[in-house]
From Swiss-Prot:
The gene is psbT. It comes from the Eukaryota. One of its GO terms (biological process) is photosynthesis. The chain crosses the membrane at residues 3-23. This is Photosystem II reaction center protein T. It is a single-pass membrane protein. The lineage of its organism: Eukaryota, Viridiplantae, Streptophyta, Embryophyta, Tracheophyta. It comes from Gossypium hirsutum (Upland cotton).
Length: 35
């Protein structure tokens, strides 16, 4: 059960950071990184 909690916290923190960068910077940078 602890593993699920830790994985959930990790995913949530990564998601928050990802969305923060996504909304702060223009999507052009993300497309360039993907290519």
């Amino acid at each position: 059960m602890e593993a699920l909690v830790y994985t959930f916290l990790l995913v949530s923190t990564l998601g928050i950071i990802f969305f923060a960068i996504f909304f702060r910077e223009p999507p052009k940078i993300l497309t360039k990184k993907m290519k």
